[in-house]
Amino acid sequence: MKRAFIMVLDSFGIGATEDAERFGDVGADTLGHIAEACAKGKADNGRKGPLNLPNLTRLGLAKAHEGSTGFIPAGMDGNAEVIGAYAWAHEMSSGKDTPSGHWEIAGVPVLFEWGYFSDHENSFPQELLDKLVERANLPGYLGNCHSSGTVILDQLGEEHMKTGKPIFYTSADSVFQIACHEETFGLDKLYELCEIAREELINGGYNIGRVIARPFIGDKAGNFQRTGNRHDLAVEPPAPTVLQKLVDEKHGQVVSVGKIADIYANCGITKKVKATGLDALFDATIKEMKEAGDNTIVFTNFVDFDSSWGHRRDVAGYAAGLELFDRRLPELMSLLRDDDILILTADHGCDPTWTGTDHTREHIPVLVYGPKVKPGSLGHRETFADIGQTLAKYFGTSDMEYGKAMF
């Protein structure tokens, strides 16, 4: 019986890539800088002391970071016994965004340039805005700028509730984000607006990766909170991923936990499980692992590392999240059968000590564990697609166009 369990710690980079200069990210190091802050006592808010990740260390995380950067992260044990196979991988794709990283993990790198809304003010073309107002019968709109999602809610949330005007905003990523209040605007109405925006972006040839619904609750600035009803409307991958091949060629199953299905535009997904927060995502993953049959992938995205702590530049929160993940990791490992493989990885970096609020161009860890997986270094991987090619070989699907099998 062949089963693979893929856990993406969203934004968990382990050191700047060779091409980081192109992105303004030379020196970025999500893991390294979190560990450094913890070791210096600068991340003691809600947690305390050096970064404590014994289980990830046993799977090779510290060694993978050493391969990427040349040093073991501060406070981590570089001499611990390693029971898994580990690598550090470079991104072939042109961007440092979520779809590019995930698609490349599944064997399909993004070799074209996404479209971006690069102006920080008046970010969106007037023609696009006019069509959205007309088609969705809107009283207008707010925002039309670059912003962090939590900041813009404090700035415009109250006005949105009074006027019914949706909040449009973007970032350095290829995204069009729409924030609306779940109760005063309505969740279904927000989703419908996002569908219209997706259509107009496609019809207008803007080549934008995702439209993201950002629902929130609360009654005034300072207590607005985004909810777990976020929805990403992505374009479809440009070629069949290893997920699609497993379903089509092997009649396999691919279970999405969290936002995986959204990222792949539901392509190659046979079951979707919603969950919000690290513990709930863990619980849902464990349930699906227990029920998984032959030729099954259970694929989970742990988005909080990125959305709650990376973008918000919350070092202590990120560290506490990693430590929670590490404490629960043995629960996953104990469920593995003889032929199973567990892959822990990331899709890009988001260094919480870095300037700004955007992603960082970094190597990702590739930690592979299973009863039959030989421990040790798998070295520097030239593309995340090596993960997809490894899965293609493991499940016996046709080869992926990109990537080399790691074992």
Curated annotation (Swiss-Prot):
- Cofactor binding notes: Binds 2 manganese ions.
Required cofactor(s)? Mn(2+)
Q: What is its EC number?
A: 5.4.2.7
CDD domains on file: PPM (cd16009)
According to its UniProt record, in which pathway does this protein act? Carbohydrate degradation; 2-deoxy-D-ribose 1-phosphate degradation; D-glyceraldehyde 3-phosphate and acetaldehyde from 2-deoxy-alpha-D-ribose 1-phosphate: step 1/2
Q: What is its main location?
A: cytoplasm
Q: Name one GO biological process term.
A: nucleotide metabolic process
Q: InterPro entries from the xrefs?
A: Alkaline_phosphatase_core_sf (IPR017850), DeoB (IPR010045), Metalloenzyme (IPR006124), Phosphopentomutase_DeoB_cap_sf (IPR024052)
Q: Where is the signal peptide?
A: none
Q: Where does Mn(2+) 2 bind?
A: 306, 311, 359
The reaction(s) annotated as catalysed by this protein in its Swiss-Prot or TrEMBL entry are:
2-deoxy-alpha-D-ribose 1-phosphate = 2-deoxy-D-ribose 5-phosphate; alpha-D-ribose 1-phosphate = D-ribose 5-phosphate
Q: Where in the cell is it found?
A: Cytoplasm
- Which keywords belong to this entry? Cytoplasm, Isomerase, Manganese, Metal-binding
For this chain, the family text in UniProt reads: Belongs to the phosphopentomutase family.
Concerning HAMAP family, the annotation shows: Phosphopentomut
Q: What does this protein do?
A: Isomerase that catalyzes the conversion of deoxy-ribose 1-phosphate (dRib-1-P) and ribose 1-phosphate (Rib-1-P) to deoxy-ribose 5-phosphate (dRib-5-P) and ribose 5-phosphate (Rib-5-P), respectively.
The protein in question is named Phosphopentomutase
Organism, by scientific name, is Shigella dysenteriae serotype 1 (strain Sd197)
Gene responsible for this protein: deoB
